[in-house]
């Protein structure tokens, strides 16, 4: 990916997919380091693991070891990406990274939030949730840049509480999110995939 992205002037946040297999993790780490050093003009940020604490593939200490290995061998800013609450549960990991990457996925939260739900003051509940979570993490880690590494809404699937998946809902979610992001100055990625 970095080679092709560079050809078109695109920047990449390159990640290593970690799991509970040390051999596979070392292969991923070595590939990440190789690409980060080989494509310095394209690889803008480096992500060591995605939601491994959520999935319980690694402990925080095991993850810390991998982050340190990468930080010693690349020049780009290094982070770990997970659902926001896992950063709050493992705050010492912040000492290992250059910035905090959180995932805010209101449809997939333990308590899903529908797009049309409103607060008593009329504000959209989902917008309040996005801003509140961002600010909660920012307050916990005031000396770290906070990046939203994943946000989005599913186009299909089952209802979760009053959270309905769908293409129209995706557009609505992104419109709400983008408005909050512009007002609050979020640095973010949007999840988008295709078959």
Language model feature labels by segment:
Residues 2-5, 25-36, 57-67, 83-99:
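Distinct, well-ordered alpha-helical segments
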Residues 15-21, 48-53, 83-86, 105-107, ...:
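Active-site beta-loop-alpha junctions enriched in small/polar residues
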Residues 145-157, 161-195:
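Substrate-binding cleft of secreted/luminal carbohydrate-active enzymes
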Residues 108-158:
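Glycoside hydrolase catalytic-domain groove-lining segments
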Residues 34-59, 87-88, 147-149:
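Active-site groove signature of glycoside hydrolases
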Residues 1-20, 24-27:
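N-terminal carbohydrate-binding/catalytic regions of secreted carbohydrate-active enzymes
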Residues 8-10, 14, 44, 82-128:
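Aromatic- and acid-rich polysaccharide-binding/catalytic face
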């Amino acid at each position: 990916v970095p080679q092709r992205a560079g050809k078109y002037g695109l920047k990449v946040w390159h990640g290593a997919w970690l799991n509970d297999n040390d051999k596979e993790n070392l292969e991923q780490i070595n590939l990440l380091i190789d690409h980060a050093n080989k494509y310095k003009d394209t690889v803008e940020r480096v992500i060591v693991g995605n939601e491994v604490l959520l999935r319980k593939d690694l402990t925080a200490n095991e993850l810390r070891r991998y982050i340190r290995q990468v930080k010693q061998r690349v020049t780009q800013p290094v982070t770990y990406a997970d659902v926001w609450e896992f950063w709050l549960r493992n705050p010492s990991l912040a000492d290992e990274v250059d910035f905090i990457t959180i995932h805010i996925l209101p449809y997939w939260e333990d308590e899903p939030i529908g797009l049309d739900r409103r607060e008593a003051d009329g504000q959209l509940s989902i917008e309040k949730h996005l801003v509140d979570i961002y600010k909660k993490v920012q307050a916990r880690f005031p000396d770290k840049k906070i990046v939203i590494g994943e946000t989005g809404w599913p186009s299909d699937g089952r209802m979760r509480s009053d959270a309905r998946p769908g293409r129209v809902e995706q557009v609505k979610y992104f419109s709400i999110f983008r408005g909050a992001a512009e007002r609050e100055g979020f640095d973010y990625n949007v999840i988008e995939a295709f078959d």
